[in-house]
């Protein structure tokens, strides 16, 4: 199995909350797609609760688009990580980490401004696969944690696993 980019960085030294350019690629049409690692929690230390991350998924995807989409950026997808320590965001364009962090922070403030469960988009059995698994209170707690701690930057070159370590962990490199 090929070694995926997300597993070539040392999760033990990764900071959170922090933004990281996980990958960039060119499409056949010449557009640049950038994938960001939006790390909410320190890996293997803390993770978001399932109800909170699910509610945040519904809110964050729209809110960050409102603050980041522009003539030079269009978000393709914002999805929670299986480990529940963050989200991956794929977009067309190349915004820098500060611009992404600023939009993320504004989106977290938007989450705090949501008043009731009925204000959560697509919260129904037709548009959500587990519509009863939500908590606005948990989502707000996650957002407040980001606001309280601020958002840093993880650079790949500072957290990359070296080839010897990857080999020792059983990876073909």
Swiss-Prot record:
Disulfide bonds: none
Cofactor comment: Binds 1 Fe cation per subunit.
Swiss-Prot/TrEMBL cofactor(s): Fe cation
Coiled coil spans: none
Gene3D superfamilies: S-ribosylhomocysteinase (LuxS)
GO biological process: quorum sensing
GO MF entries: iron ion binding; S-ribosylhomocysteine lyase activity
Catalyzed reaction equations: S-(5-deoxy-D-ribos-5-yl)-L-homocysteine = (S)-4,5-dihydroxypentane-2,3-dione + L-homocysteine
InterPro entries associated with the record: LuxS_sf, Metalloenz_LuxS/M16, S-ribosylhomocysteinase
EC annotation from Swiss-Prot or TrEMBL: 4.4.1.21
Major enzyme class: lyase
Alphabetical keyword list: Autoinducer synthesis, Iron, Lyase, Metal-binding, Quorum sensing
Residues that bind Fe cation: 54, 58, 128
Pfam families noted in UniProt: LuxS
Family the entry assigns: Belongs to the LuxS family.
The protein's assembly and partners: Homodimer.
Job description of the protein: Involved in the synthesis of autoinducer 2 (AI-2) which is secreted by bacteria and is used to communicate both the cell density and the metabolic potential of the environment. The regulation of gene expression in response to changes in cell density is called quorum sensing. Catalyzes the transformation of S-ribosylhomocysteine (RHC) to homocysteine (HC) and 4,5-dihydroxy-2,3-pentadione (DPD).
Name used for this protein in its record: S-ribosylhomocysteine lyase
Provenance organism: Hydrogenovibrio crunogenus (strain DSM 25203 / XCL-2) (Thiomicrospira crunogena)
